[in-house]
């Protein structure tokens, strides 16, 4: 297989814990680009909250909001949006089941909205500018809703009430993401392949969390980080070093010629 695209999750994968990309990794990515390999990002973050890294990487492909939005070389090629009415229903059900004080974030194509008690940028400086709202008069189409739910029974009930959505819990906390059923990273990859004229066998995908399992299984090479959850490691073709110790950079250094057939 000749690899034509390297596709990276951000948090826990391409990004170190301090939310930076190592110099070693950036150097190896540039070498790959010089050999004609495209670089892509596939993240659960909104595009808005990924801009710091998008600007640094200048990727050919950006899959954001957990697969609900796909951009190829600057042009949107796929959107899986909830209507305004559907978005209001999502918010209402979250309030009914989890309480009106539950923390919610919503991605739209242009913005990231939140009702946190604390500005998220105070906790993570890499987080892009967000728009604060109490969501009572929210009137936008949306790509993704995330809800922080500490009670497992409430989480299960909300998932049951939103059975028409794709729901994934993030492993590092109590946040659950809800998107359209069609909005997954793997489905986004299929749309991207049609536009790019490549096959999934020509993609190497890197990830660490539940939302990455499907894309690692789909792509020709699935690579799990050393810090990945066990479920991701179980489906990967390779398990490499962790995100804080140049896992990706070292993998590209040592395996590129052999596995990518360059």
PLM segments and residue spans:
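Mg2+-dependent phosphoryl-transfer enzymes with acidic/Ser/Thr/Gly-rich catalytic loops
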Residues: 1-4, 16, 22, 177-262
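Walker B beta-strand of ABC/ABC-like P-loop ATPase nucleotide-binding domains
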Residues: 7-8
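Active-site metal-binding loops of divalent metal-dependent hydrolases
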Residues: 12, 67, 207-209
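Active-site phosphate-binding/coordination module
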Residues: 18-120
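Residue-level signal for inorganic ion chemistry
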Residues: 32, 43, 66, 145, ...
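Short, structured coil segments at secondary-structure junctions
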Residues: 57-58, 66, 161-164, 218-219, ...
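Short hydrophobic/aromatic-enriched beta-strand-loop microsegments
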Residues: 59-66, 80, 124-125, 167-170, ...
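Conserved acidic, metal-coordinating active-site core of Asp-based
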Residues: 97-206, 210-218, 227
């Amino acid at each position: 297989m000749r690899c034509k695209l390297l596709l990276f999750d951000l948090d826990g994968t391409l990004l170190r814990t301090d939310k930076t990309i190592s110099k070693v990794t950036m150097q190896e990515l540039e070498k790959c680009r010089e050999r004609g390999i495209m670089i892509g990002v596939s993240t659960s973050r909104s595009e808005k909250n990924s801009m710091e890294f998008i600007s640094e990487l200048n990727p050919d492909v950006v899959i954001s909001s957990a697969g609900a939005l796909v951009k190829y070389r600057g042009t949107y090629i796929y959107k899986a949006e909830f209507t305004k009415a559907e978005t209001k229903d999502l918010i209402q059900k979250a309030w009914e089941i989890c309480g009106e004080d539950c923390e919610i974030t919503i991605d739209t194509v242009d913005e990231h909205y939140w009702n946190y008690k604390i500005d998220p940028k105070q906790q993570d400086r890499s987080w892009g500018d967000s728009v604060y709202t109490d969501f009572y008069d929210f009137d936008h189409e949306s790509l993704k809703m995330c809800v922080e739910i500490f009670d497992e029974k409430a989480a299960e009930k909300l998932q049951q009430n939103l059975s028409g959505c794709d729901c994934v819990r993030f492993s590092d906390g109590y946040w659950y993401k809800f998107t359209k059923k069609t909005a997954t990273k793997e489905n986004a990859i299929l749309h991207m392949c049609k536009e790019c004229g490549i096959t999934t066998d020509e993609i190497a995908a890197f990830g660490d969390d539940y939302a990455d399992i499907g894309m690692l299984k789909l792509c020709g090479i699935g690579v799990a980080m050393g810090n990945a959850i066990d479920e991701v490691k179980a489906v990967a073709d390779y398990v490499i070093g962790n995100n804080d110790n140049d896992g990706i950079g070292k993998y590209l250094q040592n395996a590129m010629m052999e596995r990518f057939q360059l």
